[in-house]
């Protein structure tokens, strides 16, 4: 389907970009065990009506990373790239459930970590306690996803 075409395009561009980045890092003598990579996941663009399934995103992202990122890199911290909070968490969880990878897979989300908390806060001091609870919940869900232990049944 169309979503798969866009994901393939994302895969190809991501792979080419990552290979170029690591070639340049090697040329500059960068110590790879001392870096973290902050890439996108292989997803269809946010404008695409057909997003495809969670496992396809996880499989294509891991395949892209496996083909592009040296094993010496200790960790990969993903951008959410316009995904919803739950989608970003589900995709990270699916990748970590696939088994061992040469790098730790974690998150460096902005919107996908903060969006619900900011909406709850709405600039009102009286909302701070509930805002903290919402933010803590989202962080906890992503923490579980880092070890492949997230479940949508834990969502509030």
Model-derived features with residue positions:
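Short, small-residue-biased leader/transition segments that mark boundaries at the very start
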Residues: 2-6
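Active-site capping/gating regions of soluble enzymes
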Residues: 7-156
């Amino acid at each position: 389907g169309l979503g798969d075409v866009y994901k393939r395009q994302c895969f190809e561009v991501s792979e080419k970009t990552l290979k170029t980045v690591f070639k340049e890092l090697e040329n500059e003598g960068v110590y790879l065990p001392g870096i973290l990579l902050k890439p996108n996941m292989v997803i269809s663009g946010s404008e695409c009506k057909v997003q495809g399934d969670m496992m396809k995103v996880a499989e294509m992202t891991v395949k892209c990373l496996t083909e592009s990122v040296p094993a010496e890199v200790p960790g990969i911290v993903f951008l959410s790239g316009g995904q919803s909070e739950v989608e970003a968490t589900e995709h990270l969880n699916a990748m970590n459930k696939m088994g061992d990878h040469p790098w730790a897979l974690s998150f460096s989300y902005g919107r996908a970590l903060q969006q619900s908390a900011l909406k709850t806060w709405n600039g009102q001091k009286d909302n701070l306690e509930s805002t903290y609870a919402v933010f803590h919940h989202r962080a906890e869900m992503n923490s579980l996803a880092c070890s492949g232990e997230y479940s949508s049944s834990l969502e509030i």
